[in-house]
Amino acid sequence: MQGKPTVLIVEDNVDLAEATKHFLEIKRFRVLISDGKDLYQILEQNTPDIIIMDIALGALNGREICKNLKQDDATKTIPVIMLSAHERLSKAYDDNCADGYIMKPFALTELLEEIQTLIKIPE
């Protein structure tokens, strides 16, 4: 990993995505945002070090997207943290889809710790 680690936030809640982006940029990350619809376009042009994805993306299913990413040779090694306000999130994690999961609402410091753990960044 050269330079700033890149985080891709896949979230349809614009306010949450922007607040998370701002926090992570302060912590010296490069941050990309997708609402899910343009995810594959972004991945064609960028290789993030980690993906943070909401399980519920409007009409899209974050769990299915995660499964597709883990089956694709180009993206299967990218760690994915799933976010959800619902208990069913643990199912996505248990299916070996996600590498981590965080329940909403969450503290940004909790998210940072999970990112640092999964991409091996010292605090």
PLM regions: where:
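Active-site residues of response regulator receiver
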Residues: 54
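The feature encodes the CheY-like receiver
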Residues: 58, 76, 104
